[in-house]
């Protein structure tokens, strides 16, 4: 009799626990297709600082497109006074989709070179090009 009672109690406790976790789960997320072709991206003026023998550039970026941007990639290129390429940064890659209105911080590191005069940034994503817009504030 006690064995039957213990089995019944254990079974009912197990059902209560599993029933509570099933109802407490978050609703399924809806997948949104990423932007194809040209996407719009806003950014603040880049801030460059020298750290040892590296120049570290930080850029705040905001997705202004209607959909998420998949595979965001940012490159930085440095040129000398004659316009010849001197060096460049390792590309920054954002592995997740950049959702509409989301703000992230891009950090680019470049080794210093005495010939460096000016730089240029290239923004692109896995499904096309990016049209950038300098924002006064975020």
Task: Annotate the PLM regions.
Residues 1-9:
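Bacterial N-terminal signal peptides that target proteins for export
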Residues 8-18:
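Bacterial N-terminal signal peptides
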Residues 25-58, 64, 137:
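Low-complexity, acidic Ser/Thr/Pro/Gly-rich terminal tails and inter-domain linkers that flank the onset
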Residues 26-28, 110-138:
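Terminal connector regions
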Residues 63-68, 82:
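Short, acidic/polar linear motifs in exposed loop/turn regions
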Residues 68-71, 86:
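Short acidic/proline- and small/hydrophobic-mixed sequence motifs that coincide with surface turns
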Residues 78-88:
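Short aromatic-acidic-glycine turn motif
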Residues 86-116:
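Intrinsically disordered, low-complexity Pro/Gly/Ser/Thr-rich segments with frequent PxxP/GP/PP motifs
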């Amino acid at each position: 009799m006690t064995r039957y009672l213990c089995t019944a109690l254990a079974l009912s406790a197990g059902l209560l626990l599993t029933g509570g976790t099933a109802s407490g789960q978050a609703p399924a997320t809806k997948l949104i297709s990423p932007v194809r072709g040209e996407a719009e991206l806003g950014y603040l003026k880049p801030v460059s600082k020298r750290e040892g023998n590296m120049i570290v550039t930080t850029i705040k970026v905001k997705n202004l497109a209607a959909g998420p941007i998949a595979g965001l990639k940012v490159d930085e290129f440095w040129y000398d006074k004659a316009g010849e390429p001197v060096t460049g940064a390792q590309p920054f890659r954002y592995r997740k989709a950049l959702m509409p209105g989301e703000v992230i911080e891009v950090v680019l590191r470049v080794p210093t070179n005495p010939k460096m005069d000016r730089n240029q940034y290239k923004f692109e994503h896995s499904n096309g090009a990016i049209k950038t817009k300098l924002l006064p504030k975020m």
